[in-house]
């Protein structure tokens, strides 16, 4: 709902003065090219956004020792994984990037993903050097810092990237409706041109 309000407000600003125009179906906006990255997956292979070209990519930022919102977000993604059926892994790919690279090694991320029912053929849990993670997080609008308790406060932003590598929509927080995200992903699948 928050995302829809942002999108509709932006669209209204773009098409002001067209009150007499025929209604059109709502298309997802194009924010711009998705920032490139190459990071290390749970199986220790390097994964780049370019490797995923041709698929809809849903990108989240998490850390494995988080005890509240990260598990909720990961559970939502696991539910979407199931609902996508045959499109998952074939046409849709999930990426979860840690904001705690010092603790979240590939092995730790693999255990976290497995505990949440991730199907690794379509879901990569990525880590990297602290500098790599800072760079990727910054370019996606993610801010994070370690607290005195050892937790990490960070922005919750889920980014949806189309098969051409364009950033199409971002969801703030974790209270978004999974069905809304699913519909946006399916909309992008319908927009994808066969190669």
Tell what function each PLM region has:
Residues 58-59, 94, 158:
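Hydrophobic beta-strand anchors of alpha/beta hydrolase catalytic cores
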Residues 121-123, 134, 138-147, 153-158:
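Structural micro-motif
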Residues 49-77:
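Short active-site neighborhood of thiol/selenol oxidoreductases, capturing the structured segment around
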Residues 9-19:
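Hydrophobic h-region of N-terminal signal peptides that target proteins for export
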Residues 147-195:
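Thiol-/selenol-based redox modules, centered on thioredoxin-like
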Residues 72-136:
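Structural microenvironment flanking redox-active thiols in thiol-disulfide oxidoreductases
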């Amino acid at each position: 709902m928050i995302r829809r309000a942002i999108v509709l407000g932006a669209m209204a600003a773009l098409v002001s003065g067209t009150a007499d125009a025929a209604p059109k179906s709502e298309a997802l906006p194009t924010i711009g090219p998705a920032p490139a990255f190459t990071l290390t997956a749970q199986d220790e292979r390097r994964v780049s956004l370019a490797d995923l070209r041709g698929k809809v990519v849903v990108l989240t930022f998490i850390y494995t020792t988080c005890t509240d919102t990260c598990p909720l977000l990961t559970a939502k993604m696991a539910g979407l994984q199931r609902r996508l059926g045959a499109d998952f892994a074939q046409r849709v790919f999930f990426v979860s990037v840690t904001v705690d690279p010092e603790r979240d090694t590939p092995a730790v991320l693999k255990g976290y993903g497995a505990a949440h029912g991730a199907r690794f053929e379509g879901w990569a849990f990525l880590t990297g050097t602290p500098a790599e993670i800072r760079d990727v997080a910054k370019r996606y609008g993610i801010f994070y810092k370690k607290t005195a308790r050892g937790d990490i406060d960070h922005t919750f932003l889920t980014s949806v990237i189309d098969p051409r590598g364009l950033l199409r929509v971002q969801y703030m927080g974790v209270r978004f409706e999974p069905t809304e995200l699913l519909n946006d992903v399916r909309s992008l699948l319908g927009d994808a041109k066969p190669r």
